[in-house]
Design a protein with these regions (language model features):
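Alpha-helical segment proximal to the catalytic Tyr-Lys
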Residues: 124, 168-172, 229
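C-terminal substrate-recognition "lid" of short-chain dehydrogenase/reductases
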Residues: 116, 209-238, 243
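Conserved glycine-rich cofactor-binding loop
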Residues: 10-12
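Active-site helix of classical SDR
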Residues: 119, 155, 163
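Residue(s) in the substrate-gating loop at a strand-loop-helix junction
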Residues: 139
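Substrate-binding pocket helix/loop in short-chain dehydrogenase/reductase
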Residues: 95-96, 103-108, 190, 201
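Conserved glycine-rich Rossmann-like NAD(P)H-binding loop of the short-chain dehydrogenase/reductase
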Residues: 24-41
């Protein structure tokens, strides 16, 4: 069974991705700061159909200095790591002029520095194993911008540049690196949207609807599978045609 790390996977989009990968035959190793009721319920359900395929590792990904030891532990506990989904992230709502430097640094640390450092150490395991898959979760705001999300948008744009450059670095080692850029997905990060905001977003999209967690999970699952063996350095948008 191939092992895939999913960061920020205790709830919402990350957990949806983990569950989809498990359904496709992968072992999902979820990294998050703490367990959630949503994860515990999913674990009980998954154990009935795919025993031993969903695991939890408590870790604060903002602790950059501890990431090398985390990577070593996961390799020791689960063997070679086949896939990595850099999904963990955070945002701050508000215009840049009113955002503190500490808030900016916090978002950049978790959304940009952390996935880069984790990837650095996990990719070494992939190279030693002869291949692997990396999927970075970006966002359409990296392309479109969004008022009040300038710092968040900057971090997601950096992940896209990281994806394309890393794909060229590690391609010869049999490692595919891609990104998925979701539109506004119904998760905790979008709970602050009013119903009017949701309707506006839906009206702007070609398909006149918002995106579900399952839509994004399907894209990640495709990029982890054999059907995407010749796809690398690519960004797949899952936004119901919002950026069409």
């Amino acid at each position: 069974m191939r092992s895939v790390i999913v960061t920020g996977g205790s709830r919402g989009l990350g957990l949806g991705i983990a569950r989809k990968l498990i359904a496709s035959g992968f072992r999902a190793i979820v990294i998050a700061r703490k367990l959630s009721e949503e994860f515990v319920a999913a674990k009980l359900e998954v154990e009935q159909t795919h025993p031993g395929s969903l695991h939890f590792e408590a870790f604060d990904l903002a602790q950059i200095e501890a990431i090398p030891d985390l990577a070593k532990k996961l390799r020791k506990d689960f063997g070679p790591i086949y896939g990595l989904v850099n999904n963990a992230g955070m945002s701050t709502d508000g215009v840049l002029a009113m955002t503190s430097t500490a808030q900016i640094e916090q978002v950049v640390r978790l959304n940009t520095t952390s996935p880069m450092v984790l990837t650095k150490h996990v990719v070494r395991s992939m190279m030693a194993s002869g291949g692997g898959r990396i999927v970075n979760i970006a966002s359409i705001v990296a392309f479109t911008g969004y008022s009040g999300l300038s710092v968040y948008a900057a971090t997601k744009a950096s992940l896209i540049g990281f994806t394309r450059s890393l794909a060229r670095e590690v391609g010869r080692a049999g490692i595919n690196v891609n990104a998925v850029a979701p539109g506004f997905v119904s998760t905790e990060m979008t709970q602050g949207l009013t119903e009017e905001n949701r309707q506006q977003i839906a009206r702007r999209s070609a398909l006149k609807r918002m995106v579900d967690v399952e839509d994004v999970a399907n894209a990640v699952d495709f990029l982890m599978g054999d059907g995407s063996k010749n796809i690398t350095g690519t960004v797949i948008t899952v936004d119901a045609g919002n950026t069409a």
